[in-house]
Amino acid sequence: MSNYPHLLAPLDLGFTTLKNRVLMGSMHVGLEEVQGGYERMAAFYAERAAGGVGLIVTGGISPNDHGVTFFGGSKLDHLEEAEKHKFITKAVHDAGGKIALQILHTGRYSYHPENVAPSAIQAPINPTKPHALTSAEVHQTIADFANCAKLSQIAGYDGVEIMGSEGYLINEFIAARTNHRDDEWGGSYENRIRFPIEIVRRTRQEVGENFIIIYRLSMLDLVEGGSTLEEVIQLAKEIEKAGATIINTGIGWHEARIPTIATKVPRAAFTWVTKKLKGSVKVPLITSNRINTPEMAEHVLAQGDADIISMARPMLADSHFVLKAEQGRADEINTCIGCNQACLDHIFSMKIATCLVNPRACYETELIFKESPVAKNIAVIGAGPAGLSFATYAADRGHKVTIFEASNQIGGQFNIAKTIPGKEEFYETLRYFKRKIELQPNIKLV
């Protein structure tokens, strides 16, 4: 019997079935804009599909020019672009997975001078004041979302996720904080939620019934002038009526000052918010944020907080997270420690994302570790994270590795870092390497 019966249970959506309750959450990784990026994304996502993820969601792709994060950012609004995405969908399907494209219009968070919003109110984290969309432009933006979804379907995606959370354009229409309009798209709450409802309704019309539509709903804005719980529930019901297959629950705007994914945030700290929506809608609910072990994911599902667990960064840290859980090898999972140093920090610095504990992430086409034709005897001086990482990869390739460590424990300066309040997750990396050494006969620690 599985140790994770809820997590590994299939989910019947009527027209299709997800093989388990694990969703790889959306992350922009920077491959979307680089030369050869589609081939690299294909390898990146395919490896996670082979690792057992039930449904993958891509990084955010804009439905038009105004919604890109920066000039030259990734978008999908022409058939020629859809053809490129077929590299990704074919690779994922060949690996036995399913994948949805996230449609993200960044609104006033766009870092270019032609950004737009419901009202001309500058974001505190952006130097550029947005242009307020006219009513005609609002209608065109709705059509652009539907067109992007149709192109995603043509490209072979199994569905789309409509990003309505985290303070991006859709969320900006919903919140009184950012919507000061006095037309049909502003004023009353019913008017402010017309934009997301119309996007979902038009998208469903465009793609038909047998296509997954996930709507990412902001459950907790964590900013002044955000939605109340009663308003969120009202919107969720309308989104369900409009045709959403699944609702994903988002937490916090990017300008919010309350941490939501940092390592000091307790595991599964926000699943209680998702549970508030349970019973109000019939579609499956996704919860997320700081769920990084199969044990925690199982607990969240078992207590009825949600139907699906979204894990984004944990899939950077270990592409075979789900497979290891299925095979009773959860102690071999390379756990995400929530440091954000090589994922978010890289993206904010305009670099390709990777992972502090798994530097191969997003470099699957470059770092290909095959068995070495000649086994060598290799000495590694120091059992810090770098030495441990090299030693385990070298041993996996067939080399005989001896690690020389002066202290009585592995980990180097990680042993200092893990003692800092809020950095307890760093223990997980040392646990992972300790287990790797125990299981790898090619490594000797002296």
Enumerate the language-model features and the residues they cover.
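N-terminal glycine-rich dinucleotide-binding loop that anchors FAD/FMN and/or NAD(P) in oxidoreductases
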Residues: 333, 338, 416-445
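Flavin-dependent oxidoreductase catalytic cores
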Residues: 1-381, 385-401, 406-409, 413-415
